Amino acid sequence: MSKKALCIISGGMDSTLCAYLAKKEGYEIIALHFDYEQRTQEKEKECFKQICKALKVEKSYILDVSFIKDIGGNALTDKSIDIPKNELCISDVPPITYVPFRNGIFLSIAGSLAEKENCESIFIGVVEEDGSGYPDCTDEFIQKAQEFINEGTSKNFKVCIKTPLVRLNKAKIVELALKENVPLELTWSCYESEDEACGECDSCLLRLRGFEKAGFKDKIKYKS
């Protein structure tokens, strides 16, 4: 019986690279995508499907967690709140693009699905540099989430949450992704736009800076 990993894939660079690294480690990948009615949900879903096809994933889930939009309080799900432009967040206070406890919600659901599918690992593409003050993107948080899942599931089930990128910066992530032949042109990072990336939001700026520092050109289309 092959070992299985549940890979949370948003459609972005980091989670996609994590899935490729899981495959390299010999895991059978079960792919998981969350639809929480974020601004770019349709583009992210399209990217997820293309990435699954590229990885030859046989089993995938797209789960509706739109209640996150009902909770609100962030610019990703509330279009009345402007996405900050042309500034990277360097504060310890989470920016308005922070979705409260999003990774906690995702990992709780992933823990349930991992137990059902008998996965020994969960891969999630959290990156502390990208965290921009996000408290649920730290290594410490992930370790506590793993303890929580293992405490709340059956005694004969134990899962390891793997975060191979957590200490890397964006340039190193780009370099590693290209080394592993990850099709980054299939990924999407923009918080705001679905046709052409805005090039101005925090996520676009981090992505562009990563490509620039790595010495490569990003193949996706940008408005600016």
Curated annotation (Swiss-Prot):
Pfam families: QueC. Zn(2+) binds at C190, C198, C201, C204. Transmembrane segments: none annotated. GO terms for biological process: queuosine biosynthetic process. Its EC number is 6.3.4.20. Its cofactor is Zn(2+). It catalyses: 7-carboxy-7-deazaguanine + NH4(+) + ATP = 7-cyano-7-deazaguanine + ADP + phosphate + H2O + H(+). ATP binds at I9, S10, G11, G12, M13, D14, S15, T16, L17, C18, A19. Binds 1 zinc ion per subunit. Pathway: Purine metabolism; 7-cyano-7-deazaguanine biosynthesis. Disulfide bonds: none annotated. InterPro entries: QueC, Rossmann-like_a/b/a_fold. Keywords: ATP-binding, Ligase, Metal-binding, Nucleotide-binding, Queuosine biosynthesis, Zinc. Belongs to the QueC family. Catalyzes the ATP-dependent conversion of 7-carboxy-7-deazaguanine (CDG) to 7-cyano-7-deazaguanine (preQ(0)). This is 7-cyano-7-deazaguanine synthase. It comes from Campylobacter jejuni subsp. jejuni serotype O:23/36 (strain 81-176). The lineage of its organism: Bacteria, Pseudomonadati, Campylobacterota, Epsilonproteobacteria, Campylobacterales. The gene is queC.
